[in-house]
Amino acid sequence: MAKKIIGAAIAIGLLGGVSVFVWALTNNKVVIGYNQGYEPDQPIPFSHKLHAGQYKIDCKYCHTGVDKSRHASVPSLNVCMNCHIVVKTDSPWIKKVSEAFYADKPIAWEKVHLLPDHVKFNHASHIKAGKDCTVCHGNVQEMEKIKQVQSLSMGWCVNCHRQPENKAPLNCSTCHY
């Protein structure tokens, strides 16, 4: 009798766990890196609306190498200081950037666009294919605070890859390790 109860409890637990997992995947809930709407506070506020919007600074100026590399780098403080060595130097936030720069201490920015460990995303190939950064990242030039706009789920990516005009590969190894 006890074995039957234990067996039933295990079966119910497994069924419940699988059900929750499937529900979360199909509803784009925060699971294995799909964080649509994620908008973390950063150690130093940075306005893409000001920099990319008002000043029209191209994404590739700060995110150097994004057109040649698999990854879009978080800008080094050197990039910030190219302008802020003379611009808004009296701002308390710029003073923190400057202090970190001269102390050779990188700022611990919070990563916004998270992908599962088993997924690889090559920024360079997407840029070479003519995809604008806004396709995946949204209209950052209108964002005071950066957030993840798209789900970045497998289904979302595959929908784009399946568009005939994109001529994008559909084999699993393109995106998965």
Task: Please report, for each region that a protein language model flagged, where it lies by residue.
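Aromatic-capped interface at the extracytoplasmic side
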Residues: V22-P40
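General zinc-binding finger modules coordinated by cysteine/histidine
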Residues: A100-Y102
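Alpha-helix-centered segments that form part of catalytic cores
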Residues: D104-I127
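Sequence context surrounding c-type heme c attachment/ligation sites in exported
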Residues: D41-W93, V119-Y177
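Positively charged n-region of N-terminal signal peptides that target proteins for export
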Residues: M1-I6
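Hydrophobic membrane-insertion alpha-helices, especially the h-region
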Residues: A8-L25
